[in-house]
């Protein structure tokens, strides 16, 4: 049964409110809606845009009690264009970088995926913002990736049953070490104190 009919694409649908609603991504932001079924079939009402993240959101995962969420967005990489240094060179097509792995397969890495935590309230419009979110990799090199490029996604992170911890895998390397390694490690992130502990030793 088709539930939505909008000009934009919807994805990452998640049941909320005990099956009475859905959370999903539309136009790079998280939206929620009430959902019900009756004689006329399924109906969606009460659309609410919950997030307002300038860089957009590609994926998200709710905590077990649905009071928080993890979402994937992007931070600027170290790769620079001429316009980053000279405003009048906006049409110049070139890049500068001081590190390896500035490309993944078919694209230059202008943005790096990071995962963020925020409180989640289904009907609180624009409540998930950059100011209300915590970067799981805060305090670490900005070019660490979470999820890992180029093919990983939100499946690299998972909530503990009590919602107090997040397990994630990450390749915390830069430069030549990053370029020559595909080895990710597993970390446990404490949501309350924002500290991560590596638990794998491979």
Task: Identify the meaning behind each predicted range.
Residues 71-142, 169-172, 176-187:
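Predominantly five- to eight-bladed beta-propeller fold
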Residues 13-32:
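Structural secondary-structure boundary motif
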Residues 150-160, 168-171:
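Extended surface/linker regions that mediate inter-domain or inter-protein docking
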Residues 18, 26-27, 65, 111, ...:
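Short loop/turn segments that connect beta-strands within the blades of beta-propeller domains
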Residues 1-10, 16, 33-56, 95, ...:
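Multi-bladed beta-propeller domains
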Residues 19-22, 69-70, 163-166:
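Hydrophobic beta-strand positions that form the internal "hydrophobic ladder"
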């Amino acid at each position: 049964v088709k539930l939505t009919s909008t000009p934009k694409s919807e994805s990452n649908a998640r049941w909320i409110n005990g099956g009475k609603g859905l959370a999903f991504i539309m136009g790079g932001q998280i939206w929620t809606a009430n959902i019900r079924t009756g004689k006329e079939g399924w109906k969606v009402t009460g659309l609410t845009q919950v997030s307002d993240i300038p860089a957009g959101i590609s994926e998200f995962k709710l905590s077990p009690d649905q009071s928080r969420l993890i979402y994937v967005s992007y931070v600027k990489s170290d790769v620079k264009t001429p316009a980053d240094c000279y405003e009048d060179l906006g049409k110049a097509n070139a890049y500068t970088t001081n590190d390896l792995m500035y490309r993944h397969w078919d694209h230059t890495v202008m943005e790096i995926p990071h995962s963020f935590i925020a409180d989640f309230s289904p009907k609180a419009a624009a409540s998930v913002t950059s100011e209300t979110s915590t970067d799981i990799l805060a305090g670490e090199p900005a070019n660490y990736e979470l999820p890992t490029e180029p093919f990983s996604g939100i499946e690299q992170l998972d909530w503990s049953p009590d919602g107090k911890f997040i397990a994630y895998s990450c390749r915390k390397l830069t430069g030549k070490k990053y370029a020559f390694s595909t080895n990710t490690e597993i970390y446990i992130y404490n949501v309350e104190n924002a500290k991560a502990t590596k638990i794998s030793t491979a």
